[in-house]
């Protein structure tokens, strides 16, 4: 379901950092990294975010700049990384790849005609999370002693499962699909200035007079990352149809419509591949020297791009006591 459509249904409210202080947040690593990656590329020179051999390391700058926001508000992040891409999501991945390739061509044209503003905007659209980006991010998080969980499939689904089990307090993601995966509470806008936004699953269901299963059915009718929706159906129409007919199958029968792999899509949200075999530590004891050396020496990031962030991490971890006990 498109983010704009699902946002219309979600129960959202601004929440002060003080109100969630002391919490553990399962962060959708892919979602968080992508936002910092595109932002870093916009405001950082090429020399700062690529090595001499051309390897992109903007993610390391993003991690160092982004982590202090958690620590300064006494929040413990747990980064949940995606596993393999599900077969049903391959088409979306291909579409994103095509969009990136088109953006690369447009960026080159903008640079050729000297339009620096357009080139800068297009550059952010060309970003992708490579295996090197994932591995270097893991390397830095490990040196900072930030917990990492490897999901068998969708990171959002794994993060939601951890919240359902009570192992974490919130899921951290900008994606509204966390509602469909059953996350009780999602904290949004963790990469933005100002206070975050809290998304509440039970209030969403109550406000829309839906069960979670019916919310998933509404999403499938509108379209998700795993399927195309029914033409002409938006969230209001989908809710009305579900209220009238009860579930997805009855709506499809009544409208004489068909959604390919609808049963599998439904299962991916309601019974996704997740694991309960993980060890979660919430005591943060970063090796700052090792982290600095990894970023500056091993990956050639200019020290002046990250030193302020490292100082904030060091200060905030000690001040909040994250290195002792959460």
From Swiss-Prot:
EC number(s) from the headed UniProt entry: 3.1.-.-
Region (Interaction with PCNA): 318-326
Region named I-domain: 118-246
Positions with a binding annotation for Mg(2+) 2: 175, 177, 225
Keywords, alphabetical: DNA damage, DNA repair, DNA replication, Endonuclease, Exonuclease, Hydrolase, Magnesium, Metal-binding, Nuclease
Required co-factors: Mg(2+)
Annotated region (N-domain), positions in chain: 1-100
Gene3D superfamilies, alphabetized: 5' to 3' exonuclease, C-terminal subdomain, 5'-nuclease
InterPro entries recorded: 5-3_exonuclease_C_sf, Flap_endonuc, Flap_endonuc_arc, HhH2, PIN-like_dom_sf, XPG-I_dom, XPG/Rad2, XPG_CS
A single GO molecular function term of this UniProt record: DNA binding
Pfam family, any one: XPG_I
Binding sites annotated in the UniProt record for Mg(2+) 1: 28, 82, 154, 156
SUPFAM superfamilies: 5' to 3' exonuclease, C-terminal subdomain, PIN domain-like
HAMAP family noted in UniProt: Fen (MF_00614)
Record-stated family: Belongs to the XPG/RAD2 endonuclease family. FEN1 subfamily.
Function: Structure-specific nuclease with 5'-flap endonuclease and 5'-3' exonuclease activities involved in DNA replication and repair. During DNA replication, cleaves the 5'-overhanging flap structure that is generated by displacement synthesis when DNA polymerase encounters the 5'-end of a downstream Okazaki fragment. Binds the unpaired 3'-DNA end and kinks the DNA to facilitate 5' cleavage specificity. Cleaves one nucleotide into the double-stranded DNA from the junction in flap DNA, leaving a nick for ligation. Also involved in the base excision repair (BER) pathway.
Name of the protein in its database record: Flap endonuclease 1
Native source species: Haloquadratum walsbyi (strain DSM 16790 / HBSQ001)
Gene behind the chain: fen
């Amino acid at each position: 379901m498109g983010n704009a459509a699902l946002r219309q249904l979600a129960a959202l409210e601004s929440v002060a950092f003080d109100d969630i202080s002391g919490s553990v947040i399962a962060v959708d690593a892919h979602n968080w990294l992508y936002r910092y990656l595109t932002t870093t590329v916009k405001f950082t020179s090429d020399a700062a975010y690529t090595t001499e051999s051309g390897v992109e390391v903007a993610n390391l700058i993003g991690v160092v700049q982004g982590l202090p926001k958690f620590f300064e508000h006494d929040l413990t992040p747990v980064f949940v990384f995606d596993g393999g891409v599900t077969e049903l999501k391959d088409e979306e991945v291909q579409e994103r790849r095509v969009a990136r390739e088109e953006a690369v061509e447009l960026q080159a044209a903008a640079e050729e005609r000297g339009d620096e503003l357009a080139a800068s905007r297009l550059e952010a659209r060309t970003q992708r999370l490579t295996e090197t980006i994932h591995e270097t991010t893991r390397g830095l998080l490990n040196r900072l002693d930030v917990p990492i969980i490897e999901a068998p499939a969708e990171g959002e689904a794994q993060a939601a499962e951890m919240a359902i089990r009570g192992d974490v307090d919130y899921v951290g993601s900008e994606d509204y699909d966390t509602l469909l995966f059953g996350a009780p509470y999602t904290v949004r806008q963790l990469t933005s200035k100002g206070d975050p936004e809290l998304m509440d699953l039970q209030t969403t269901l109550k406000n829309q007079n839906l069960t979670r299963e019916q919310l998933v059915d509404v999403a499938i009718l509108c379209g998700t990352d795993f399927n195309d929706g029914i033409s002409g159906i938006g969230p209001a129409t989908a809710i009305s149809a579900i209220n009238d007919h009860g579930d997805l199958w009855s709506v499809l029968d009544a409208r004489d419509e068909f959604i390919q792999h609808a049963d599998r899509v439904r299962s991916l949200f309601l019974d996704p591949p997740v694991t309960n075999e993980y060890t979660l530590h919430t005591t943060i004891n970063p090796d700052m020297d090792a982290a600095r050396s990894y970023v500056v020496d091993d990956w050639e990031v200019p020290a002046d791009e990250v030193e302020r962030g490292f100082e904030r991490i060091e200060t905030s971890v000690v001040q909040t006591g994250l290195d002792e006990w959460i």
